[in-house]
């Protein structure tokens, strides 16, 4: 379930980044799935394995083989075979449970196959200690044990969804055979039993701001497309750290006006006790009350203020780190955000004005002739202790980005100790996108 959530959130982030590209949404592997017969109690789904290649990887005197399947994820058990997986999401009925049954399969077998093991550590071009589960490679059985998995239902704002993970490659260490599933047909069965994360009713008023995300990750979104009203103004909820500085108020009003000029509906509140309040609980409740009313349900929540300074806004703590993401858990008991959230992390008026000038330059006053930096990206991953997935997600972002814009260039930095001077230098030179995954603590 955890890796399914990670995949979904990665797709969410990418969909946000490319939301303005109407006809150039990055490709994904949803094309590997097609929908079959459906009714109120079941849905048939057909899977066809996309084209893949085999590459050799030499470690010492041993030659391993690696399966290359663009845009796919992989199993991430350190030292075990690195085998691609393919996922999609399905919108399911608002109530009930889901199970599946495999109907038919077509597979081939590649004999004498030695798969490259998953490595926890630096990017593949850097020296590191080689990791292999010798116990499995010497006498293990079939890995993975299951052909497919489905997650528990989650709520992604308007939809109740499940994630389906197909494991099209299965390795048997005893025989040395790699089984490749070329075609799989399966059926999802929907029951009336009480399930988890149920919705009150089927989607009737879908957020246009989430439209590209739904289109990108929900395989059967076309069944619901007509319930989304095109060109609906995005709704912003801006919450700022309470203060009485008239210069701050003037700058804030200018920012709100700019959002309205762009066509957004904007609601504004401070952390005064009479408004949103100054604790995580009161602010979360304030956002929740706005969300529960379809007339005020925010698509975007923007905090103005850092965790210290003149405009403080409190934060949640996750694994000893500060986060605002918990504020977006507004529907269901899952960890999928139900609105977008961002923080303008400023401690004083001077910082606020600098950030606003950058926002206006980017959104309103940009000089395209001098904006080559829009085609540059910085990708960085700190894999200690977060693991190799910090690199895999950045590589995935790179693949998706190049499908959208082949002119993108990249500065990449991976390792257990990120090179902060490289990161700062790259940011100062200008980038259109910056993605960092892992632990971070530098000025």
Question: Which residues are covered by each model-predicted region?
Answer:
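Cysteine-dependent hydrolase recognition
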Residues: 19-443
């Amino acid at each position: 379930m955890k890796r399914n959530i990670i995949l979904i959130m990665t797709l969410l982030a990418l969909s946000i980044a490319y939301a303005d590209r109407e006809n150039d949404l990055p490709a994904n592997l949803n094309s590997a799935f097609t929908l079959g017969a459906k009714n109120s109690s079941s849905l048939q789904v057909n899977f066809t394995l996309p084209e893949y290649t085999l590459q050799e990887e030499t470690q010492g005197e041993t030659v391993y083989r690696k399966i290359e399947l663009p845009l796919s994820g992989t199993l991430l058990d350190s030292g075990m075979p690195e085998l691609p997986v393919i996922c999609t999401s399905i919108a399911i009925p608002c109530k009930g449970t889901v199970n599946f049954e495999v109907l038919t399969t077509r597979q081939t077998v590649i004999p004498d196959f030695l798969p490259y093991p998953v490595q926890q550590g630096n990017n593949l071009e850097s020296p590191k200690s080689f990791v292999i589960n010798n116990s499995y490679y010497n006498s293990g059985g079939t890995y993975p044990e299951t052909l497919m998995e489905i997650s528990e239902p989650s709520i992604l704002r308007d939809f109740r969804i499940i994630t389906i993970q197909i494991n099209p490659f299965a390795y048997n260490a005893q025989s040395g055979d790699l089984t490749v599933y070329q075609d799989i047909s399966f059926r999802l069965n929907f029951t009336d039993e009480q399930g988890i994360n149920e919705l009150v009713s089927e989607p009737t008023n879908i957020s246009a701001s989430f439209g590209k995300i739904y289109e990108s990750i929900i395989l059967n979104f076309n069944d619901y497309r007509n319930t989304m009203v095109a060109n609906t103004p995005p709704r912003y909820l801006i919450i700022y750290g309470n203060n009485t500085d008239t210069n701050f108020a003037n700058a804030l009003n200018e920012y709100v006006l700019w959002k309205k000029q762009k066509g957004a509906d904007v609601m504004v509140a401070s952390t005064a006790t009479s408004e949103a309040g100054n604790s995580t609980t009161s602010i979360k409740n304030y956002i929740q009350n706005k969300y529960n009313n379809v007339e005020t349900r925010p698509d975007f929540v923007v905090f103005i203020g850092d965790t210290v300074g003149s405009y403080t806004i409190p934060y949640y703590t996750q694994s000893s780190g500060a986060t605002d993401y918990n504020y977006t858990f507004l529907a269901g008991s899952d960890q999928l955000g139900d609105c977008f959230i961002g923080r303008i992390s400023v401690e004083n008026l001077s910082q606020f004005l600098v950030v606003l000038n950058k926002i206006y330059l980017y959104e309103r006053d940009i000089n395209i002739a001098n904006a080559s930096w829009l085609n540059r990206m910085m990708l960085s991953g700190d894999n200690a202790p977060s693991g190799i997935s910090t690199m895999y997600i950045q590589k995935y972002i790179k693949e998706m980005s190049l499908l959208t814009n082949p002119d993108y260039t990249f500065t990449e930095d991976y390792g257990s100790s990120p090179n902060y001077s490289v990161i700062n230098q790259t940011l100062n030179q200008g980038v259109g996108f910056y993605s960092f995954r892992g632990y971070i603590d530098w000025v």
